[in-house]
């Protein structure tokens, strides 16, 4: 009987130790660096597991902060940087292909006029604020959101929503292309916008407070419309999701 109790006590202690280890919070490791960037320079971030947040500021430099979330079974990644006076390119470098990728979340500050020519992640959201240069952003599983856009935007998602709030419309020669497969698209325009809209959804609705005639019934719907005198081409496409085009209440 004594041996049985001792055995049960040992098993209980082992189970408790395993549960404690599995419940241990993941470790966070922070890396940060700054690089000068010429006016109108280019910034790119390539990631796999984790989000990308970019914010514009008044300094002529790029500040990159990477936060790695080291959970059980993951190995620390390296942060690769290629830089020149006109370009800063950041990439997550994993030690081995057969290991589970560690989560790396990027927080990046860039000059307001910088061009974001390649914000890429596989599993994670992309958020952009107060950047007035051209933007190209792509994620497979995550949302894309930009506040204060004023130039060409190319945003693509597979499973995720896209939200774009424009401070000003780009020039007539520029384009806005927002595309997702499984997700909604929300576009907020200045109230006196001049643009040419092309919208299409296969299983969803198109709604707008800027257009006179819109589709209120779900289904395979395509709509073209000109706002004001026309201008930059705006293409909004989703397969399974709704599209909305409304005034940006923060811009008059």
Can you annotate each of these PLM segments?
Residues 1-252:
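Intrinsically disordered, low-complexity terminal regions
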């Amino acid at each position: 009987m004594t041996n049985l109790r001792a055995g049960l006590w040992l098993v209980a202690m082992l189970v408790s130790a395993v549960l404690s280890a599995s419940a241990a919070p993941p470790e966070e490791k922070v890396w940060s660096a700054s690089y000068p960037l010429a006016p109108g320079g280019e910034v790119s971030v390539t990631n796999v597991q984790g989000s990308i947040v970019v914010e514009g500021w008044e300094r002529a430099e790029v500040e990159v902060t990477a936060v790695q979330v080291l959970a059980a079974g993951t190995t620390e990644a390296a942060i690769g940087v290629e830089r020149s006076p006109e370009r800063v390119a950041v990439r997550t470098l994993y030690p081995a292909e057969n290991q589970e990728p560690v989560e790396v979340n990027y927080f990046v500050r860039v000059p307001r006029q910088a061009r974001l020519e390649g914000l890429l992640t596989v599993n994670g959201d992309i958020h952009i604020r107060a950047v007035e240069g051209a933007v190209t952003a792509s994620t497979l599983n995550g949302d894309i959101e930009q506040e204060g856009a004023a130039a060409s935007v190319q945003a693509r998602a597979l499973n995720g929503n896209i939200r774009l709030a424009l401070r000003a419309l780009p020039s007539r020669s520029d384009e806005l292309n927002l595309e997702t497969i499984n997700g909604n698209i929300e576009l907020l325009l200045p109230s006196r916008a001049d643009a040419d809209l092309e919208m299409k959804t296969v299983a969803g609705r198109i709604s707008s407070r800027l257009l006179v005639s819109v589709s209120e019934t779900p289904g395979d719907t395509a709509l073209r419309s000109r706002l004001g005198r026309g201008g930059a081409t705006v293409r909004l496409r989703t397969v399974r999701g709704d599209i909305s085009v409304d005034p940006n209440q923060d811009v008059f």
